[in-house]
Each structure stands twice: as structure tokens, then as C-alpha cells.
């Protein structure tokens, strides 16, 4: 243990006083920033596509018809039960094994054979399974009183979902959705395994040329921490803005009668 401390102290002294690490940082920082941009594209595009895919999956999942809920059940079970790395390899290496896929013309040459699009496809499929389960739970957690009020007003089922249930469910899943996006950000490092120059891919390239593994992994870790902090702040602001009416309702009820606020909270729990 003492030898490890001594070696780390020597490395830290060399790192802080030597010029070589800082010169290497300055030389490869533009490539790392390009990798940051690619990582952000992966997370943003996959997060949006996965969110859109999750809505019909969640609606089918809560259906009483076996013909509708069997497919999303199997889909969610597969993508939640297998490693993301395996899913990336299945999309990038697996699709090329089928001649019918290779004969798709520009769809093959421009999309399905490119690591960038294969990574987006794999991440979108993976995150849609998790978000679909979040949506399913949120839809079932919408207070029954709100749905019953809409039914008493004669609002159609489609408009109930469009104007009441889905918007309410989105507010419920926002914190969990933010966590899912952050997990996807950290999982995006696996995209470098299919030759994509995201942040981790650019970091590995810099290490291969400079042999400064610890220094560049530390820098990559700091950049991932910065991206995570930005996402946390963004989703916190989004949650406060989107659910502002809920906080305002609780405050207004408490001013009238504290028992009304307690009753409102009990209805939400139910």
C-alpha cells in the first residue's frame, strides 16, 4: 500500500510539474471536443426517438387484448434483459449477415453499415424499452379522479389520452426519464467499440498515440461529469417548469384549508 502511495505521488508530481501532459491535452483537446459533440448527438437523438417509440409500446402494454400486449412485453423483456453491448453488436455486425439487408441500396450503404446510425438504432431500441415501462407505470398512476371527471364530461377516450392522461404521465416520469438519459450518456461510451469516434473513442485514440492512459481517462471522466451536470440541471428546470401547476395547486389548497391539500395528496397516491 505504501509503495502504491509513493508511485501515485511521483506520478502526480510529474503530472503537475511536467509540460508533456499539458502539451498533449492541448494537442488532442479539439478531437475530444469533437467526440463530446458526437456523444451529445447520440444521447439527444436516441433519447427523442426512444421516447417517441415508448408511447405506443406503453399503450399496447396496458391493453387488455393479448394480441396487443404480447409484442411489447417480449420487446421490453429482450432489450431490458440483454446487455447494451450485445445489442450494439447485433445491430452493427448482425445485420450485415443477411444478404437481403445488404441489397437495400442506399439504406445499407448510407445508414445500416455506418457505425453512427447503428449506434443510434441500438440506443433508441434499448432506451425505448425502459421508457415504455416508465410510461406504463405513470399512466396507471394517473389519479382516477381526473379520468372519471373527463368521462363525466363526455370526453372521448382518444382525447382523454391526448389532453389528460399522457401529459399527466409525462410529468410523473420526468425525474425517472432524466435518470434514464443520464444512464444512456454513460452507456454511450460503448459506441466506441464499433469504431465510432465519440468521447470515449477519441480518448482511446489519444491514448494509443501518447500512451498517457491515466491522464486522458481522467480528462474524459471530467468531461462526462460536466455533461452529466448539464443534463441534471436541464431536467431539473424542465421538471420545475412542467410540474409548476402541481406545486401551485398544493400551495393554493393549503391557503384555503390544509385538509384540502391532504385530500389532494391522498387522491394522487391512489
PLM regions with names:
Residues 1-270:
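Transmembrane alpha-helices and adjacent helix-loop boundaries
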